[in-house]
Amino acid sequence: HTAYRRQRQMCIRDSYMTSLAILHECGYEIDNIIEKTKDVKAPKGRCETHKVNGGYAVIDYAHTPDAVEKVITAYNELKKGKVITIVGCGGDRDPIKRPIMGNIATTLSDYTILTSDNPRTEDPEKIMEDILKGVKTTNYEVELDRKTAIKKGIDMLQPEDILLILGKGHEDYQIIGHTKIHLDDAEEVENWKKCH
């Protein structure tokens, strides 16, 4: 658990150091900034780690090819077991990144569950077709229902495995059509724990 806590601290540190540099450039004294920010905590949904089913579920807002690659790569460096990734692509957004995301997730992860992530007004199956165009491996499955995808991912965990649940982070909704439906990745992990 220490290694995963360290990864979360690295995420926080990188953001903190960037903020520190910007504030200093704006004329604030470093010592004053450090004093005022010493109790700052990481935002919900950024490298947020939950111990579950003998492994770890990590919820992160990574939703671009670059961010997904960085998160999976970082956890591959820490892993003692497998890295299982749950990821999708948003609807009514840049379709060019979809096959790239599919390729990155399936190439860098030991196993991937491709799912929905705010399909909005697009057909989730069409979004998935776009994602699958980039997939060159067989270490994946498609589960369009995000809640079910999270349950499946947790069920797969073996001791020391890491389940990366990417894309929504702090969001507590799924947009289907023009309607926001309650869906919170962290809550789904906690619900699984309550039922098992």
Question: What is the predicted role of each segment?
Answer:
Residues 1-14, 112:
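Single conserved hydrophobic/aromatic residue that forms the stacking wall/gate
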